């Protein structure tokens, strides 16, 4: 048998190393090409390391908790063309998925070579987990082509109904331990020590760095959300039927922010030593809460996207975030961040800048309250807006003007159409 190394994937320049989180196979286990063998965690995302071939797991060189670098050998596989189940430690359990009965199309022996060819030919279109699912469920070539085409538009797992257990495997129980079970101090306090994930450590470092290295200030305003609420109520059903996605509030804010950034270019910029660098593009980071912590994937060139495209992108980020499948590249860059504490019920907050960006907009809960309009008291659905910014680059005049610009657009969205 030929030994094949299991390697750490190439990591971006901004990522120096990763931590081995969980081995899904033991030494002696049978592995198949594209099986998820081990999970590793970087400062930003969780990565699945898949088997490069069929064979038997020969050795584990880097155990859970070890720090590894790009292209480092994690373990070795004894490659074989045919894997005998009696040679491995694996127990074979047959499962029946009722959801797949109508969609699964079983292949014949003659079709297997064609399927392998299609998988290889479409390697760049399918992630390891996608290729693994195709093999597990014996999808035939016609259905595979349908999956490849459709997966460009929607979530792959929704098409072939892949078992949900896989997306819930990484729960980080390995990172949780009790330093001393029922450890008690002099005051009889019971404690439980929990090790921080790498993502949480990185978040802590970046937040502290932001506070210590920026002259951060927060300005507040409020916006009447009734026009947007009525707009969603009037066109929401037609929008969903046409675009197959619900229209939320975030796409309105993305559009409003882009227009405001065009009017206040110093907010779409950053400081590089003694220079101010102005962005020409509009890459908007959207804060998303995941089981591992807060991440900010980037909607690139958002100014060229429709409302539907923005909503689909946000939905895709949310699904991938919950499944720990956000790609590293999707988190890199970004000129300006929008965060919505309102989904948790936050009435007001002071969001922290996401360096090297110079500003972040905080959305909050929509709450009906009395407001004086033209000398009359009205009950309106109001939202507080918060703009945290680096005072080294942005003055109070620009920050207030930026918020008022967003407020005016949201209260009269027709401004977007006529560019005012």
From Swiss-Prot:
Forms a 24-polypeptide structural core with octahedral symmetry. Part of the 2-oxoglutarate dehydrogenase (OGDH) complex composed of E1 (2-oxoglutarate dehydrogenase), E2 (dihydrolipoamide succinyltransferase) and E3 (dihydrolipoamide dehydrogenase); the complex contains multiple copies of the three enzymatic components (E1, E2 and E3). Residues 3-78 form the Lipoyl-binding domain. GO terms for biological process: L-lysine catabolic process to acetyl-CoA via saccharopine; tricarboxylic acid cycle. The modification N6-lipoyllysine is found at residue 44. Belongs to the 2-oxoacid dehydrogenase family. The gene is sucB. Binds 1 lipoyl cofactor covalently. It comes from Buchnera aphidicola subsp. Acyrthosiphon pisum (strain APS) (Acyrthosiphon pisum symbiotic bacterium). Pathway: Amino-acid degradation; L-lysine degradation via saccharopine pathway; glutaryl-CoA from L-lysine: step 6/6. E2 component of the 2-oxoglutarate dehydrogenase (OGDH) complex which catalyzes the second step in the conversion of 2-oxoglutarate to succinyl-CoA and CO(2). This is Dihydrolipoyllysine-residue succinyltransferase component of 2-oxoglutarate dehydrogenase complex. Its cofactor is (R)-lipoate.
């Amino acid at each position: 048998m030929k030994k094949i190394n299991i390697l750490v994937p190439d990591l971006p320049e901004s990522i120096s190393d990763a931590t081995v989180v969980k081995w899904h196979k033991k030494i002696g286990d049978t592995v198949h090409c594209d099986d998820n063998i081990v999970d590793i965690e970087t400062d930003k995302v969780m990565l699945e390391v898949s088997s490069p071939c069929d064979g038997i797991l020969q050795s584990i060189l880097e155990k859970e908790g070890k720090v590894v670098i790009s292209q480092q050998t994690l373990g070795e596989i004894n490659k074989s063309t045919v894997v005998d189940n009696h040679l491995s430690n694996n127990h074979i359990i047959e499962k029946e998925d009722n959801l797949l009965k109508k969609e699964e199309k079983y292949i014949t022996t003659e079709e297997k070579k064609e399927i392998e060819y299609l998988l290889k030919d479409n390697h760049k279109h399918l992630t390891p987990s996608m290729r693994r699912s195709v093999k597990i469920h014996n999808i035939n070539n016609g259905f595979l082509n349908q999956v490849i085409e459709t997966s460009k538009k929607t979530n792959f797992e929704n098409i072939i109904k892949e078992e949900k257990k896989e997306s819930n495997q990484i729960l980080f129980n390995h990172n949780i331990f009790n330093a001393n079970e029922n450890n008690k101090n002099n005051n009889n306090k019971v404690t439980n020590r929990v090790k921080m994930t790498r993502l949480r450590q990185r978040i802590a470092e970046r937040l502290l760095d932001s506070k210590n290295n920026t002259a951060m200030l927060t300005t507040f305003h409020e916006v009447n959300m009734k026009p947007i609420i009525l707009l969603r109520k009037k066109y929401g059903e037609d929008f969903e039927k046409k675009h197959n996605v619900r229209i939320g509030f975030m796409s309105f804010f993305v559009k409003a922010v882009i227009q405001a950034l065009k009017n206040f270019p110093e907010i779409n910029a950053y400081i590089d030593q003694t220079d101010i660098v102005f962005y020409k593009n509009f890459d908007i980071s959207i804060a998303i809460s995941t089981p591992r912590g807060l991440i900010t994937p980037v909607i690139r060139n958002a100014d060229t996207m429709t409302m539907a495209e923005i909503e689909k992108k946000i939905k895709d980020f949310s699904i991938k975030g919950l499944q720990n499948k956000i790609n590293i590249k999707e988190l890199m860059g970004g000129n300006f961040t929008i965060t919505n504490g309102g989904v948790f019920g936050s009435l007001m907050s002071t969001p922290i800048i996401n360096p090297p960006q110079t500003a972040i907009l905080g959305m909050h809960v929509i709450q009906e309250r009395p407001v004086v309009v033209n000398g009359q008291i009205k009950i309106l659905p109001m939202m507080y807006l918060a703009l945290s910014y680096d005072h080294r680059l942005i003055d109070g005049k620009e920050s207030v003007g930026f918020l008022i610009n967003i407020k005016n657009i949201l209260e009269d969205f027709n401004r977007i159409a006529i560019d005012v």
